[in-house]
């Protein structure tokens, strides 16, 4: 077959030789490398136990505590209680008690719902038990860097169910450039090692959900493919439906067979900053000053906004740009508080994987003890608060401070201790280094 025979094309997809990487010839037919890959994928999917008859694929190696719970039965007595879930969250996330309680109760009820479904499937449920437990999806509202995503990531470490995180900013309505909403389920399926039954009892966290608000309160004549269109596409998934999930994402491989996933028992947690939502609430509540005293005087702007959001009503979210049908499918709303200076101080030192502990461990591997003076921690928290990006600013500041230290110390065998001072934070000066006595030059004898 000549490399330059432009009339040759794939007998399956019709693409010419110039459009594919490889064209394989057969007796009077040709097949391209893309169609070969597609055939392999279809054969691999036949191995999935979609109907309970085929063999399961070999699971990935996982830590013992995770492997123990995969595909295992759920006993009501083994379900973690809300207090236990919150206690674990307290070890990793500072503050946000209301959001922790909402998540703890929601996850606990999610487990109970799965236990009831399992008892009905095994015939252990009472014959007259006709009550069906419906899920209550969650909406987390709060400024950037206050712990919404960290709460979701921390939950993923303790759950006995698959947990996936998705970003709403990449989603578009079907038929337009971007990701389909079914790709969210694909992430959950991948976390569950392509185990469909396991994925159908999982939890999905959708971040930046406020970015799909429609551009105006009134329905637009033109299509809003990344806003209202995405909200419409998410409705059935949030409520519960049989979704067709393409194993490779759909857009680049349109001819693949889809995997069907029932979303009825998948719990959805949505989070977003919703910048400007407090102004919508203010307009509805109609806060007015009497005399010269302003409401919330003496509070920071962020604290006033958080207090205002305590009076949030569904109509406020509609005015912000969320459609009523979407709001009805996320009935539980929790407001995440902004982080003040004291909270940022606590984040530096108190959590199990606190930032200071991380850098202390890094330097300990070089046999150097790292210390932060209290006034240095205060200066770091103050600078992070001024940056207005929440806890995310802390890592950037500490990374700037420790760059030169972490560059030099691996080559310095004479240093035993490094101390970060307030002056170092404010002026970006050099850290205080303590030299091992044996490395000091010995005084000359007379």
UniProtKB/Swiss-Prot annotation:
Assembly notes: Component of the ClpX-ClpP complex. Forms a hexameric ring that, in the presence of ATP, binds to fourteen ClpP subunits assembled into a disk-like structure with a central cavity, resembling the structure of eukaryotic proteasomes.
List of residues binding ATP: 143-150
One GO CC term on file: HslUV protease complex
UniProt cross-references to InterPro entries, sorted A to Z: AAA+_ATPase (IPR003593), ATP-dep_Clp_protease_ClpX (IPR050052), ATPase_AAA_core (IPR003959), Clp_ATPase_C (IPR019489), Clp_protease_ATP-bd_su_ClpX (IPR004487), ClpX_bact (IPR046425), P-loop_NTPase (IPR027417), Znf_CppX_C4 (IPR010603)
Domain ClpX-type ZB: 1-51
Entry's family note: Belongs to the ClpX chaperone family.
NCBIfam families named among the record's database cross-references: clpX (TIGR00382), PRK05342.1 (NF003745)
GO molecular function: ATP binding; ATP hydrolysis activity; ATP-dependent protein folding chaperone; protein dimerization activity; unfolded protein binding; zinc ion binding
Functional description taken from the UniProt entry: ATP-dependent specificity component of the Clp protease. It directs the protease to specific substrates. Can perform chaperone functions in the absence of ClpP.
Name of the featured protein: ATP-dependent Clp protease ATP-binding subunit ClpX
Residue numbers binding Zn(2+): 10, 13, 32, 35
Domain of life: Bacteria
Keywords, in A-Z order: ATP-binding, Chaperone, Metal-binding, Nucleotide-binding, Zinc
GO biological process: cell division; proteolysis involved in protein catabolic process
PROSITE patterns per UniProt: CLPX_ZB
Region (Disordered): 54-76
